[in-house]
Amino acid sequence: MGNCLDSSAKVDNSNHSPHANSASSGSKVSSKTSRSTGPSGLSTTSYSTDSSFGPLPTLRTEGEILSSPNLKAFTFNELKNATKNFRQDNLLGEGGFGCVFKGWIDQTSLTASRPGSGIVVAVKQLKPEGFQGHKEWLTEVNYLGQLSHPNLVLLVGYCAEGENRLLVYEFMPKGSLENHLFRRGAQPLTWAIRMKVAVGAAKGLTFLHEAKSQVIYRDFKAANILLDADFNAKLSDFGLAKAGPTGDNTHVSTKVIGTHGYAAPEYVATGRLTAKSDVYSFGVVLLELISGRRAMDNSNGGNEYSLVDWATPYLGDKRKLFRIMDTKLGGQYPQKGAFTAANLALQCLNPDAKLRPKMSEVLVTLEQLESVAKPGTKHTQMESPRFHHSSVMQKSPVRYSHDRPLLHMTPGASPLPSYTQSPRVR
């Protein structure tokens, strides 16, 4: 696909282990993982409780990455057969990177099977001229070919035949969080489901951040959070992932790349990347879950507003919090839990990166919120008044500052892309 890297090219990623401390149990898991067959028929991972593990190779050649024993190398014809020649009626979504199709493979051999039989998968086909180039494609294969966790999307295999670049993932029937929050006609998510999704996403980020060789996700957003049939959240699209700082380094200096509205301000301004950059992005998504609004909103007469700038004045005020709560919740949420979630978002969005909590700390709070939000749990409902979307935006017209050093923006991508793509900062 265009100017591809040759087989000896290196991928810029440092050591990273697929094992982290569990924020809920406090126990470590080891790098001794084994793949087993889950309910869907696809390979999942079981973990040993051995606390000893070592780092993965710092740099790997393309040949080493593509020879991962955890991934199947598909031929282009196999994926053509699996998707019925990429027929439009199998199209799941489309974005700047290309298209995603539903496909079927045999559970045992992983070869193409008849539509409706075998295992359903999502096949992402990159456009040669798309925004997600070979380097990002290879980075995703590199990370997901080694990392395995219940809250990371499972990469089944890939195709690198000629200029064709495809990725084969487990199928996520509920699609992206972005669709559920913002797509017209979507069934509103209950408060309990929103907290469940937040917990799952937080577990995925905690796993990446607390691995022995840290991984910074760098593109955390609603479009990259995919949901299975039970609304369990899994992180997808690792094309922008970056190895965390090593040794005495406190940050990684890198080209500014991410998504407009989600990227941490200090990263946009300086290119200094830390795990706290991901924490900021998580705060934005948590704010989207609370408010039902996009990170960047241009619905008010075409003027673009930052959700963070607009909502921040209300997050720490119990009496005014109802003004930013998603009206689609119909007032059905615990007042105390909503205020705790709002305060947590405020902490994640602290302009001073050092004062933001760790993802493991965020996870502890979210798990407490999830436990009291489960159906059947008694809590105080907070009735929010009915008001029109645009009138709320006018209550606090903090306009997004366009003098920030933002770079070129392109659409983001995920195995099951959203109907409307979030702009990516480059």
Swiss-Prot record:
<keyword id="KW-0611">Plant defense</keyword>
<feature type="modified residue" description="Phosphothreonine">
    <location>
        <position position="75"/>
    </location>
</feature>
<keyword id="KW-0597">Phosphoprotein</keyword>
<dbReference type="GO" id="GO:0005634">
    <property type="term" value="C:nucleus"/>
</dbReference>
<dbReference type="GO" id="GO:0006952">
    <property type="term" value="P:defense response"/>
</dbReference>
<protein>
    <recommendedName>
        <fullName>Probable serine/threonine-protein kinase PBL2</fullName>
        <ecNumber>2.7.11.1</ecNumber>
    </recommendedName>
</protein>
<dbReference type="GO" id="GO:0106310">
    <property type="term" value="F:protein serine kinase activity"/>
</dbReference>
<keyword id="KW-1003">Cell membrane</keyword>
<feature type="region of interest" description="Disordered">
    <location>
        <begin position="374"/>
        <end position="426"/>
    </location>
</feature>
<feature type="compositionally biased region" description="Polar residues">
    <location>
        <begin position="417"/>
        <end position="426"/>
    </location>
</feature>
<feature type="modified residue" description="Phosphotyrosine">
    <location>
        <position position="267"/>
    </location>
</feature>
<keyword id="KW-0449">Lipoprotein</keyword>
<feature type="compositionally biased region" description="Low complexity">
    <location>
        <begin position="14"/>
        <end position="38"/>
    </location>
</feature>
<dbReference type="InterPro" id="IPR050823">
    <property type="entry name" value="Plant_Ser_Thr_Prot_Kinase"/>
</dbReference>
<feature type="modified residue" description="O-UMP-serine">
    <location>
        <position position="253"/>
    </location>
</feature>
<feature type="binding site">
    <location>
        <begin position="92"/>
        <end position="100"/>
    </location>
    <ligand>
        <name>ATP</name>
    </ligand>
</feature>
<feature type="region of interest" description="Disordered">
    <location>
        <begin position="1"/>
        <end position="54"/>
    </location>
</feature>
<feature type="modified residue" description="Phosphoserine">
    <location>
        <position position="253"/>
    </location>
</feature>
<keyword id="KW-0519">Myristate</keyword>
<feature type="modified residue" description="Phosphotyrosine">
    <location>
        <position position="169"/>
    </location>
</feature>
<dbReference type="GO" id="GO:0004674">
    <property type="term" value="F:protein serine/threonine kinase activity"/>
</dbReference>
<dbReference type="GO" id="GO:0005886">
    <property type="term" value="C:plasma membrane"/>
</dbReference>
<keyword id="KW-0067">ATP-binding</keyword>
<feature type="domain" description="Protein kinase">
    <location>
        <begin position="86"/>
        <end position="369"/>
    </location>
</feature>
<keyword id="KW-0547">Nucleotide-binding</keyword>
<keyword id="KW-0723">Serine/threonine-protein kinase</keyword>
<feature type="active site" description="Proton acceptor">
    <location>
        <position position="219"/>
    </location>
</feature>
<feature type="lipid moiety-binding region" description="N-myristoyl glycine">
    <location>
        <position position="2"/>
    </location>
</feature>
<dbReference type="GO" id="GO:0030957">
    <property type="term" value="F:Tat protein binding"/>
</dbReference>
<dbReference type="InterPro" id="IPR008271">
    <property type="entry name" value="Ser/Thr_kinase_AS"/>
</dbReference>
<dbReference type="GO" id="GO:1900426">
    <property type="term" value="P:positive regulation of defense response to bacterium"/>
</dbReference>
<keyword id="KW-0472">Membrane</keyword>
<comment type="function">
    <text>Involved in disease resistance signaling. Contributes to pathogen-associated molecular pattern (PAMP)-triggered immunity (PTI) signaling and defense responses downstream of FLS2. Acts as a BIK1 decoy and enables Xanthomonas campestris AvrAC/XopAC detection; X.campestris effector AvrAC/XopAC-mediated uridylylation promotes the formation of a complex with RKS1 and RPP13L4/ZAR1 which, in turn, activates effector-triggered immunity (ETI) against X.campestris. Promotes, when uridylylated by AvrAC/XopAC, the release of ADP from the inactive RKS1-ZAR1 complex, thus activating the resistosome.</text>
</comment>
<dbReference type="InterPro" id="IPR001245">
    <property type="entry name" value="Ser-Thr/Tyr_kinase_cat_dom"/>
</dbReference>
<keyword id="KW-0418">Kinase</keyword>
<feature type="compositionally biased region" description="Polar residues">
    <location>
        <begin position="39"/>
        <end position="52"/>
    </location>
</feature>
<feature type="binding site">
    <location>
        <position position="124"/>
    </location>
    <ligand>
        <name>ATP</name>
    </ligand>
</feature>
<comment type="similarity">
    <text>Belongs to the protein kinase superfamily. Ser/Thr protein kinase family.</text>
</comment>
<dbReference type="InterPro" id="IPR000719">
    <property type="entry name" value="Prot_kinase_dom"/>
</dbReference>
<comment type="subunit">
    <text>Interacts with FLS2. Interacts with the Xanthomonas campestris effector XopAC/AvrAC; the recognition of X.campestris effector XopAC/AvrAC requires the presence of RKS1 and RPP13L4/ZAR1. Component of a stable high-order oligomeric complex made of RKS1 and RPP13L4/ZAR1 which recruits X.campestris effector XopAC/AvrAC-mediated uridylylated PBL2 in the presence of ATP to form a wheel-like pentameric resistosome; this complex triggers immunity toward X.campestris in vascular tissues. Binds to RKS1 when uridylylated.</text>
</comment>
<feature type="modified residue" description="Phosphothreonine">
    <location>
        <position position="254"/>
    </location>
</feature>
<feature type="modified residue" description="Phosphothreonine">
    <location>
        <position position="259"/>
    </location>
</feature>
